[in-house]
Regions:
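Sec-dependent N-terminal signal peptides of Gram-positive bacterial secreted proteins and lipoproteins
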Residues: 1-26
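Periplasmic-binding protein-like
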Residues: 106-111
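Short, glycine-/small- and polar/acidic-enriched structural segments
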Residues: 131-137
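Exported/periplasmic ABC-transporter solute-binding proteins
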Residues: 22-75, 94, 101, 113-114, ...
């Protein structure tokens, strides 16, 4: 009997010592420091993962004539959305249309004509509800600054006064507008004989600015940003459809919510003012 009591007493003592040791370890400063370090590491990892999740790259495909204005708008947007990277592809609207059709990364498309946007939408490649008519531009005839070329109208380009005229090719909206204008004037055959075809409107602008062409046909906004050219005149009234710039979200956008936020930014008064500073006519309305 005494042995049993002695054994029970010994067992209780062992349990008590073990419990005390555990309690002592829980208060050990080195143990707490390890636990705190682990918590901080886990918190840092969570914050890093959250930060990575917020970083987004939006691919904006836009007509070449929008290069300067969208570059300024992008700077403004970055101030308000530092987590968003805007990556632009500027080219002719026809080239950009082909890129979207072939599956190139694209979140937002801004065309220099309705034709390309409508064709993409008919193929089911655009979010139809997101498409808006954003801007209007003017088609103008230009010559190099200080040029003595004696022309005053689109009709004069067909005369012997002009040896080479720079125009956009057939898949470039400004080239399509040019063809329509001269077909309506009954002068398209004469123009083709002296035409030098460019891949986009900025190439037309460059050829005239560097005097590699006598004259050229561009948008008013392009002429406004190039000091080495001057506007001769606007296209004859009624000679072509208005140069409307539609914008919309690509159906397969990887980031449709962020693309919508960028589209909403284009609708603000702040951005409207920037567009107008570059001589665009802002036509969007709710």
């Amino acid at each position: 009997m005494r042995r049993k009591k002695w054994f029970v007493a010994l067992l209780c003592a062992v349990v008590g010592i073990t419990a005390a040791a555990c309690e002592g370890n829980s208060d050990d400063p080195s143990t707490k420091e390890v636990e705190n370090t682990q918590e901080r590491t886990q918190q840092s990892e969570r914050e890093t993962e959250e930060g990575k999740a917020e970083e987004v790259e939006l691919h904006i495909l836009a007509a070449a004539s929008m290069t300067d204005v969208l570059t300024e708008i992008a700077d403004k947007y970055k101030e308000e959305h530092p987590e968003i990277t805007l990556t632009f592809s500027f080219d002719s609207s026809g080239t950009l249309q082909t890129q979207i059709e072939e599956g190139a990364p694209a979140d937002v498309f801004i065309s220099a004509a309705l034709k390309q946007m409508n064709e993409l939408n008919e193929q089911g490649l655009m979010d139809e509800d997101s498409i808006i008519e954003l801007l209007e531009n003017k088609v103008v005839l230009i010559k190099s600054k200080g040029s003595e070329l004696d022309i005053a109208s689109f009709e004069d380009v067909a005369s012997d006064k002009v040896t080479m005229a720079a125009i956009g090719n057939s898949d470039v909206p400004v080239g399509q507008y040019t063809q329509t204008i001269y077909e309506n004037l009954g002068l398209w055959d004469q123009i083709q004989e002296k035409a030098n075809y460019a891949t986009n409107v900025r190439q037309v602008l460059d050829w005239v600015a560097t005097k590699n062409a006598d004259c050229g046909i561009v948008y008013a906004t392009d002429a406004a940003i190039e000091p080495e050219v001057e506007i001769v005149c606007e296209a004859p009234e009624g000679s072509c459809m208005p140069a409307i710039y539609p914008a919309g979200i690509v159906k397969d956008s990887e980031y449709p919510e962020q693309a919508k936020e960028f589209m909403d930014f284009l609708k603000t008064d702040e951005v409207k003012e920037i567009f107008e500073n570059y001589q665009f006519t802002y036509i969007y309305s709710e």
